[in-house]
Amino acid sequence: XTLSEPEPTCSIEYFRYQAIEDCEYSISVK
């Protein structure tokens, strides 16, 4: 990915761009 296109799933790379809380939120929504 890239910063312009964050992955829909929570991944290590995603943590670099978004806070862990946001990552967990994405999982809950999905």
Swiss-Prot record:
UniProt keyword annotations, A-Z: Calcium, Fibrinogenolytic toxin, Fibrinolytic toxin, Hemostasis impairing toxin, Hydrolase, Metalloprotease, Platelet aggregation inhibiting toxin, Protease, Secreted, Toxin
The question of whether Cell membrane is a record keyword is answered with no
Protein's cellular compartments = Secreted
MF term (GO), any: toxin activity
Please indicate if the UniProt record lists ATP-binding as a keyword. Answer: no
What does the record give as EC number?
3.4.-.-
Required cofactors, per record?
Ca(2+)
Q: Identify one Gene Ontology CC term for this UniProt entry.
A: extracellular region
GO annotations under biological process? proteolysis
Its annotated function is as follows: Cleaves fibrinogen Aalpha (FGA), gamma (FGG) and Bbeta (FGB) chains. Degrades cross-linked fibrin. Has no amidolytic, plasminogenolytic or caseinolytic activity. Inhibits platelet aggregation induced by collagen (IC(50)=7.5ug/ml) and various other agonists, presumably via activation of a nitridergic pathway. Inhibition is accompanied by reduced ATP release from and surface expression of SELP and CD63 on platelets as well as increased intracellular levels of Ca(2+), cGMP and nitric oxide synthase activity.
What is the name listed in the Swiss-Prot or TrEMBL entry for this protein? Hementerin
**Organism for this UniProt entry:** Haementeria depressa
